[in-house]
């Protein structure tokens, strides 16, 4: 009786195809604890992303401007492999890595077309949580 299991059936591994996108959007979400950079095509499909935690920072070091710089560089390099050359930047959040992430996108060779602040602000909507007493 032959042993159970697969017999000579090789598993097919699908390679990730390279999209050729020259222009896209860079979404930078900068919170007090982390910075997330997502680079998308104009219709919103994510081409590359990186965050301060994904790059290798842990704990309170994720919230530093240097961590935001490294995350933006990592996302930009991967987007350039897909042919990205120009981005429009959308910045969201109050964190410390906002300007540093934009500067590092420019430094890696991506041409920054426009910069927009899309931080959501309430028109006096929900009641905020009570103040912290430390």
From Swiss-Prot:
Protein's GO biological process: translation
Gene3D superfamilies recorded: Ribosomal protein S11
GO terms, molecular function: rRNA binding; structural constituent of ribosome
Basic residues composition-biased segments: 9-22
Protein origin, superkingdom: Bacteria
Sorted UniProt keywords: Ribonucleoprotein, Ribosomal protein, RNA-binding, rRNA-binding
GO cellular component: ribonucleoprotein complex; ribosome
Keyword Signal: no
Function: Located on the platform of the 30S subunit, it bridges several disparate RNA helices of the 16S rRNA. Forms part of the Shine-Dalgarno cleft in the 70S ribosome.
Subunit structure as annotated in this protein's UniProt entry: Part of the 30S ribosomal subunit. Interacts with proteins S7 and S18. Binds to IF-3.
Family (UniProt): Belongs to the universal ribosomal protein uS11 family.
Record's protein name: Small ribosomal subunit protein uS11
Organism: Streptomyces avermitilis (strain ATCC 31267 / DSM 46492 / JCM 5070 / NBRC 14893 / NCIMB 12804 / NRRL 8165 / MA-4680)
């Amino acid at each position: 009786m032959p042993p159970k299991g697969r017999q000579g059936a090789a598993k097919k591994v699908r390679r990730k195809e390279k999209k050729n996108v020259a222009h896209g959007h860079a979404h930078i979400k900068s919170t007090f604890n982390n910075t997330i950079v997502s680079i998308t095509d104009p219709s919103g499909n994510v081409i590359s992303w990186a965050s301060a935690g994904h790059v290798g920072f842990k704990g309170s070091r994720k919230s530093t401007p240097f961590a935001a710089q490294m995350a933006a560089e990592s996302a930009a390099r991967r987007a350039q492999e897909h042919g990205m050359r120009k981005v429009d930047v959308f910045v969201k959040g109050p964190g410390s890595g906002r300007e540093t992430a934009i500067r590092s996108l420019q430094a890696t060779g991506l041409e920054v077309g426009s910069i927009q602040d899309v931080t959501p602000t309430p028109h006096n909507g929900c009641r905020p949580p009570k103040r912290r007493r430390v």
